[in-house]
């Protein structure tokens, strides 16, 4: 399948939200019950690091960064979110998206990317490891999903090799 990776646009939101919701519904991707509105999502995510993989007009997946803090000393640290449409998983799209997000983050001056991934989401953990992230810890029983099940979260990190720290 041919696809391109480019900046997310406002008119991508309906498809992005549907992909996000599909991930939420797995019970292994997020501690929330529904995708937020565009306005809420737009305020939370870094405007300069939002990508989609698309084939024609179809969004196949998305990746974006959330700043971890508004403190200037942490301005180069962000959390990764990456979600793929169920029908497009296992095709290398996630690897391409995450690698492109890493490059874009370095262009924008981020020196550390981190991800918090539910222990059960082994595919996402492997994706991050493939893209150079390392496990740095575990937060046990961090939160519960809508089914009232507690989940451990694996902390993963990637330090930039190009952004001076």
Label each PLM-derived region with a short phrase:
Residues 29-87, 98-99, 104, 159-161:
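Acetyl-CoA-dependent GNAT
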């Amino acid at each position: 399948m041919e696809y391109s990776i480019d900046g997310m646009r406002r008119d991508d939101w309906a498809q992005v939200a549907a992909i996000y919701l599909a991930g939420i519904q797995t019970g292994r991707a997020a501690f929330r019950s529904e995708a937020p509105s565009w306005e809420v999502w737009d305020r939370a995510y870094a405007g300069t690091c939002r990508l989609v993989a698309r084939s024609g007009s179809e969004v196949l997946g998305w990746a974006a960064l959330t700043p971890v803090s508004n403190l200037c000393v942490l301005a180069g640290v962000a959390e990764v979110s990456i979600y793929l449409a169920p029908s497009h998983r296992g095709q290398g799209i996630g690897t391409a998206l995450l690698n492109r997000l890493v490059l874009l983050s370095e262009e924008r001056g981020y020196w550390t990317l981190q991800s918090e991934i539910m222990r059960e989401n082994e595919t996402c953990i492997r994706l991050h490891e493939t893209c150079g992230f390392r496990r740095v810890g575990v937060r046990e029983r961090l939160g519960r999903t809508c089914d009232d099940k507690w989940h451990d979260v694996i902390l993963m990190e990637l330090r930039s090799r190009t952004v001076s720290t």
